[in-house]
Regions:
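Forkhead-associated
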Residues: 5, 9-110
């Protein structure tokens, strides 16, 4: 089985502030604490929010109702806000929605 690396970056004002490439299943978190993968000011997310976490067959991407941007899952580009609002699969609690992601998926997400 081929390992697919996961690349995530924190971009602010079109500048890469941090870039992480992982090859083993690892949570990618955003939050105010120094323990977060990407440290950000309080933006209304739970502390150390796991935006990406290992799932049963890869990774799970969790998006919140106040996030914006574009994701491409299984070759289909979708608006983040529309994706979170439409709760036909991958439901999450209280304004969040999770979906499995694979090696060819991508996204640009505004927190």
């Amino acid at each position: 089985m081929t390992t697919v690396a996961l690349r995530t970056a924190l971009i602010w004002n079109d500048e890469v502030m941090d870039d992480v490439v992982i090859e083993k299943p690892t949570r990618i978190t955003v939050g105010r604490s120094g323990k977060a993968t990407f440290v950000v000011p309080d933006i209304g997310l739970p502390p150390d929010f796991a935006i990406v976490r290992p799932g049963n067959r890869g990774y799970l991407l969790t998006l919140g109702e106040h996030m914006r941007g574009t994701i491409c899952i299984d070759g289909e580009e979708r608006d983040v806000a529309d994706f979170v609002r439409r709760r036909d699969d991958g439901d999450g609690p209280g304004g969040f929605r999770a979906t499995p992601i694979s090696g060819r998926d991508w996204g640009v997400i505004n927190l």
